[in-house]
Regions:
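Short loop/turn segments that connect beta-strands within beta-propeller blades
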Residues: 169-172, 239-243, 283-287, 347-351, ...
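A flexible loop/linker signature enriched in serine peptidases of the S9 family
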Residues: 132-135, 151-164, 182-188, 203-234, ...
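Beta-strand-rich domains and repeat architectures in extracellular enzymes and scaffolds
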Residues: 114-117, 126-159
Length: 446
C-alpha cells in the first residue's frame, strides 16, 4: 500500500510540473509569431485539464489514505464513483496532451474559419497572420522585400472604405505595425511601391469627393456580383508619410489597377479612356503611353513578369450577342461583372497575347512566379456555386494545373517576395467564422 501511495504522490508531483509547463507554454503562445485563436484555446484547455487532473490526483491520494486507514469514511459505492471520476479525468488529460499547443490546427473540414494551415498546403511553411479583423486585401512587397502595402476597410476604426496602408514586415514574434499613406478621403485601390522604396502609387477617388463612393445596388442586376468602375479614380504617387507628390493620370473615367515594371520605370494600368476597359503602359519618366489591349472586354489586374519580358492579366471576352449586350450595358453605368474571367499573357509590349486558362468562372489575380514561367492565380472554377476561391499554379502554356491553397472561403492576391523565398496572400482563414479577410505571410516551399 505504501508503494502505491508513493506512486500516486509521484504522479501528483509530475502532473503539477506539467501544469506549470502548460501555463508557461500558454504565455509563450500569446507572444509568439503564431497568433492563433485555436492555439490559444487549446493551450487554455490543456492548462485547465492539467490543473483539474492534478487536483483530482491530490484528492484521490488523500481519500485513499483515509479509506485504507483503520477508520474508513466512504462507502464502497462512493469509492467506486470517485475512482470512475478519477479515471475519466485521466483519460481527458491524455486526450488533451495529444495536442501540441504550438502546432497549427489542420482540420481540413473546418467550417468555422479557425484554421491557419491545411495539411495539403505543402508549399507554405512558417505561416504568419499579419492582420486581424476588417477587410485587408492586395498586400504587395516593396522592391527591397522589407515592406508591404495593402488596402484596408475597418468600420470599427472609422475606415468605412478601402484606404492605403504600409507596414514593415515584422520579425518572428513581433507585431505587424502599419500606418495609412492615403488621404483618408474617398476610396483607394491597388497600391504599389516605387523602385526607390521611398514612394507608393495607388488609385484614389478623393478628387471626386471626401466620402466613400456609393456601392452599386446588385438587386438591380439580378443580384450578380459586379465591380464599380468609379469615374473619379485616378492614380497618384505619394511619399511614405502620405503626401501626394504627383498625379499620374488625369483622363476622364476610371484609371486604376496599377503596378510597376521590375526596373520601376514603367507603369501598367487599366483605363476606360478610349471607351473600353483596356491596359496601358506609361513611361514614368516621360509620361508617354501605349495602349496594350484592344479587344472588347474587361482587361485588368496586370503585372510584369520578374524578368520584365512579359505581362500577365485577367480578362473577360464576351462573345455571344447576349454577353456583348450585357457587358456594354454595365460598362455604360461604370460597372463590370467579374464572374467570367480568364488569365492572359503577352510580351511586355502587348504583342503575342494568348489565353492561358479556359476554365470558366472567375480566374483572376494572376502573377508570374519567380521563374517568370509558371503562374499563380486565384480561381473558383472547381465550384459551380462560385465559392470558395483558392490559389493554383499553372504553366504558361496552360498545362500542369496544381492546387495550392485549401481554405473553404477565400484565398487570393498572391505575390512573391523579390528573392522568391516568401509569399504573401489574403484569406478568410482563421477569422473565427466572421467575414474578415486578413493578410498572411509564409515561406515558399517548392
Amino acid at each position: 500500500m505504501a508503494g502505491y501511495l508513493l506512486g500516486l504522490a509521484r504522479l501528483k508531483a509530475a502532473l503539477f510540473n506539467v501544469t506549470v509547463i502548460a501555463v508557461y507554454v500558454a504565455q509563450i503562445a500569446t507572444i509568439s509569431s503564431y497568433p492563433m485563436r485555436v492555439t490559444s484555446s487549446l493551450v487554455t484547455a490543456y492548462t485547465g485539464a492539467a490543473c483539474n487532473v492534478t487536483s483530482y490526483f491530490y484528492l484521490a491520494t488523500r481519500i485513499i489514505r483515509i479509506q485504507y486507514s483503520r477508520q474508513p469514511i466512504l462507502k464502497r459505492s462512493h469509492m467506486q464513483k470517485l475512482v470512475a471520476l478519477f479515471i475519466s479525468c485521466c483519460l481527458l488529460f491524455a486526450l488533451m496532451t495529444a495536442f501540441k499547443p504550438r502546432t497549427v490546427v489542420v482540420n481540413a473540414d473546418s467550417t468555422n474559419g479557425d484554421t491557419l494551415l491545411y495539411p495539403e498546403e505543402k508549399h507554405f511553411k512558417n505561416i504568419q497572420q499579419l492582420t486581424f479583423g476588417g477587410d485587408n486585401a492586395e498586400a504587395y512587397f516593396s522592391y527591397d522585400g522589407q515592406w508591404l502595402i495593402f488596402q484596408r476597410t475597418q468600420p470599427k476604426e472609422g475606415i468605412l472604405c478601402d484606404q492605403m496602408f504600409i507596414g514593415k514586415i515584422p520579425k518572428p514574434g513581433e507585431k505587424f505595425e502599419y500606418k495609412m499613406v492615403s488621404t483618408g478621403k474617398g476610396r483607394t485601390t491597388c497600391g504599389f511601391f516605387t523602385r526607390d522604396n521611398k514612394h507608393v502609387i495607388y488609385a484614389s477617388t478623393h478628387l471626386g469627393g471626401d466620402e466613400c463612393p456609393p456601392v452599386p445596388d446588385r438587386s438591380k442586376y439580378g443580384n450578380k456580383y459586379i465591380w464599380p468602375l468609379y469615374p473619379s479614380y485616378d492614380i497618384f504617387m505619394a511619399d511614405l508619410n502620405g503626401k501626394i507628390v504627383k498625379q499620374l493620370t488625369n483622363s476622364p473615367g476610371y484609371d486604376a489597377e496599377a503596378t510597376l515594371s521590375p526596373d520601376g520605370t514603367k507603369m501598367i494600368y487599366t483605363s476606360v479612356k478610349d471607351g473600353d476597359i483596356d491596359l496601358y503602359i506609361m513611361d514614368l519618366e516621360t509620361g508617354e503611353e501605349k495602349r496594350v489591349t484592344n479587344t472588347l472586354g474587361y482587361d485588368g489586374g496586370a503585372w510584369f513578369s520578374p524578368d520584365g519580358k512579359k505581362i500577365i492579366w485577367r480578362a473577360s471576352r464576351p462573345k455571344t450577342p447576349e454577353e456583348i449586350r450585357e457587358y456594354k450595358e454595365l460598362l455604360a453605368q461604370n460597372l463590370v461583372a467579374p464572374t467570367n474571367m480568364e488569365v492572359f499573357v503577352a510580351n511586355a509590349d502587348g504583342s503575342d497575347a494568348r489565353q492561358v486558362t479556359a476554365f470558366g468562372q472567375a480566374n483572376w489575380a494572376p502573377v508570374f512566379m519567380p521563374d517568370s514561367k509558371r503562374i499563380i492565380f486565384a480561381s473558383n472554377h472547381e465550384y459551380k456555386r462560385g465559392f470558395p476561391f483558392n490559389m493554383y499554379i499553372i504553366n504558361e502554356d496552360g498545362t500542369g494545373l496544381q492546387k495550392v491553397s485549401r481554405d473553404k472561403g477565400f484565398d487570393a492576391f498572391p505575390m512573391f517576395s523579390p528573392d522568391g523565398k516568401k509569399i504573401v496572400f489574403c484569406s478568410n482563414r482563421n477569422n473565427g467564422g466572421t467575414r474578415d479577410t486578413n493578410i498572411f505571410l509564409a515561406d515558399w516551399v517548392e
